[in-house]
């Protein structure tokens, strides 16, 4: 039971990053907006899938990054903020949580359910008019007509998809494949009508 306490505390950093990593977040997003079910859910960029893949070379930085450096990049780009220093409470919390979920997984392996599913190229070229209609019919209910999400009692309950309170140029979501794969996993229920965020999906718990 005692071993779970650090992981539970770290869970709060993933779910409410702006509060528990204050000073390093420059927008309204939390880690769990992209890493669903607080980083647990398979095929939704789970943290347990990423942890065992590092150290790894990243073209964005032009060097081999360790997991700490990868998390720092998330704060700089996806959170549009600043990188917490190595050994800071925020990074140690995220590293502890990721390690706890990935414990026992083979290091260096591409685990089933890591990352996002591959999305095939669309049969038609991108079209703003079609996209506007799809957004109005499928996305605006949660994210708003302007894509800026929704806040309740001062807390962001649905994330902004673009703009000053969202990610910047360096985030993975600037590539069309990442938000498409994420939205398919995040926003759609399965055939049984079960929300994907209700399913277990960690290396330890799946």
What residues fall within each predicted segment?
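Cationic, amphipathic, low-complexity alpha-helical segments enriched
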Residues: 1-8, 172-181, 186, 191-202
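Post-cleavage N-terminal segment of exported redox proteins
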Residues: 1-16, 56-129
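Short, well-structured alpha-helical segments
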Residues: 91-95, 197-204
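Sequence/structural segment immediately N-terminal to covalent heme-attachment motifs in c-type
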Residues: 1-38, 122-158
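Amphipathic alpha-helical interaction surfaces
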Residues: 34-40, 77, 100, 104, ...
């Amino acid at each position: 039971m005692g071993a779970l306490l650090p992981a539970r505390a770290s869970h709060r950093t993933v779910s409410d990053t702006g509060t528990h990593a204050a000073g390093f977040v420059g927008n309204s997003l939390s880690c769990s907006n992209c890493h669903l079910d607080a980083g647990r859910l398979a095929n939704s960029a789970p943290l347990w899938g990423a942890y065992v893949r590092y150290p790894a070379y990243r073209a964005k930085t032009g060097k081999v990054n360790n997991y700490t450096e990868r998390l720092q990049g998330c704060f700089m780009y996806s959170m549009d903020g600043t990188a917490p220093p190595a050994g800071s409470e925020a990074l140690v919390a995220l590293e502890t949580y990721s390690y706890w979920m990935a414990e026992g997984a083979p290091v260096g392996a591409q685990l089933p359910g890591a990352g996002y599913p591959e999305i095939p190229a669309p049969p038609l070229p991108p079209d703003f008019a079609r996209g506007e209609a799809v957004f109005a019919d499928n996305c605006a209910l949660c994210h708003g007509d302007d894509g800026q999400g929704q806040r309740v009692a001062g807390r962001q309950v649905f994330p902004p998809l673009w703009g000053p309170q969202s990610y910047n140029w360096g985030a993975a979501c600037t590539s069309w494949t990442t938000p498409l794969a994420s939205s398919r996993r995040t926003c759609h229920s399965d055939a049984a009508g079960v929300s994907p965020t209700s399913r277990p999906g960690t290396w330890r718990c799946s």
